[in-house]
């Protein structure tokens, strides 16, 4: 007899594909920061005001020269540029040196009674320069400051000077007056400081250089107008 037929196994259902995730809802777009505009700024280091040149790189003003047309130089206490005020604190070395400014012909200089630091050779060889005033708060006449200013007749207000540098007044052949200079207060006199001042005369009497600590060679050479008996401290 025929064998009973086996029931067919139910067909396996094909595995269903995983459900696709719905894309996440997009949030508000991030705002990009506004682009910064670069603005170039430049620090002022030098400028010219009223025909006088200044360096202000240190934060204060130092005089570095002037226009060749200037004959009467007056140093101000302060100077303003681009809405900023600077205190005038000094005069740069060689600022008015004839060797660097051969067309400049200064006649008078007024330092305004300011406590300036004045560099070497500041006025050397200014052959038209006749008078210098306003040195009330200057304590040192720097090396070669007035060397060969042959028309210079008077330097005033030297009462606070304690140091006269190398050749400071050498070959100032017309100089007759160093107003207020107290030789008793000088602590240092440089080499040839007063050499060849042919028009200068000073009667010292019996004079002691009480404060003097340094006296270099030929300090008073060829300056016959200084007379008297000079007494030097034993430490010299």
Q: Residue spans of the language-model regions?
A:
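N-terminal low-complexity, Pro/Thr/Ser-rich intrinsically disordered segments
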Residues: 15-54
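Structural signature of tandem-repeat unit edges
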Residues: 51, 58-60, 68-90, 101-117, ...
